From Swiss-Prot:
Localization annotation: Cytoplasm
KW Metal-binding (keyword) present: yes
GO cellular component labels: cytoplasm; ribonuclease H2 complex
Cofactor: Mn(2+); Mg(2+)
An annotated Gene Ontology molecular function: RNA-DNA hybrid ribonuclease activity
Lineage: Bacteria, Pseudomonadati, Pseudomonadota, Gammaproteobacteria, Pasteurellales
Name of the protein described by the UniProt record: Ribonuclease HII
Gene of this entry: rnhB
Family matches, as NCBIfam families: PRK00015.1-1 (NF000594), PRK00015.1-3 (NF000595), PRK00015.1-4 (NF000596)
Pfam families: RNase_HII
Length: 197
C-alpha cells in the first residue's frame, strides 16, 4: 500500500468498494470490510490488478482474518428504477449496514459517498491506497465473478463467464442473436435497443 494516504483518526475503519457498475447484466455488488490491525494480510491490492487465483486466495484470507465483512448489492431492477449511481450508493449502504461491528469511520473508493450514519470520506484510487478498500474490492469482485459463473451455467450461450457481463463485442453479438435475459439491465442503452424500448 502507498503511504501517502493519511488515515482518519478513528479506531474502527471500514473500507467500501463496488464492482459491476459498467456491465449490462446482473447486480452491482459492494463490500465493506473492517480489517484486524493485529492480523495483517500481505499482498492486498486493487482487485483489477490481481490474477483470479490470487484474488480467490486473498478473499478467503480476508474472510478469515478481518474483524468483520459484509456484501451489499443492488439488483438489475433497482438499477433500472434508480439509475446506476443511486443503485451503487444503495448497495454500499447495505454493505455497511450488514457489518456486525459498527465502524467509527468509512472510507469509500472513488469520489462519492453514500449517506451513512457515521463519518465517511471518498478516496480517489482508494483501492490502491487503502488496505480496507483493497480488501473490499477483492471480496466484491470475487462475489460478482461467482454470480457471473452461475449465470453462465443458466445461460451458456451468452459467454458470461468470459466477459462478466461487460459490454464486449462478444456480449453485443450474443445480445443481437439471443435477445436479453431477465437479468439484463433494461435501462442500459445496448439492452434498451435490443428490447426496442
Amino acid at each position: 500500500m502507498s503511504t501517502n494516504f493519511i488515515y482518519p483518526n478513528a479506531h474502527l475503519i471500514a473500507g467500501v468498494d463496488e464492482v459491476g457498475r459498467g456491465p449490462l447484466v446482473g447486480a452491482v455488488v459492494t463490500a465493506a470490510v473492517i480489517l484486524d490491525p493485529n492480523n495483517p494480510i500481505e499482498g492486498l491490492a486493487d482487485s483489477k490488478k490481481l490474477s483470479e487465483k490470487k484474488r480467490l486466495l486473498l478473499a478467503e484470507e480476508i474472510k478469515a482474518k478481518a474483524l468483520c465483512w459484509s456484501l451489499g448489492r443492488a439488483e438489475p431492477e433497482e438499477i433500472d428504477r434508480l439509475n446506476i449511481l443511486h443503485a451503487t450508493m444503495l448497495a454500499m449502504q447495505r454493505a455497511v449496514a450488514g457489518l456486525n461491528i459498527q465502524p467509527d469511520f468509512v472510507l469509500v473508493d472513488g469520489n462519492r459517498i453514500p449517506t451513512l450514519p457515521m463519518p465517511a470520506q471518498a478516496v480517489i484510487k482508494g483501492d490502491s491506497l487503502v488496505a480496507e478498500i483493497s480488501a473490499a474490492s477483492i471480496l466484491a469482485k470475487v462475489a460478482r465473478d461467482q454470480e457471473m459463473a452461475e449465470l453462465d451455467v443458466q445461460y451458456p450461450e451468452y459467454g458470461f463467464a468470459k466477459h462478466k457481463g461487460y459490454p464486449t463485442k462478444l456480449h453485443f453479438e450474443k445480445l443481437e442473436q439471443f435477445g436479453a435475459t431477465p437479468f439484463h439491465r433494461k435501462s442500459f442503452a445496448p439492452v434498451k435497443k435490443i428490447l426496442g424500448l
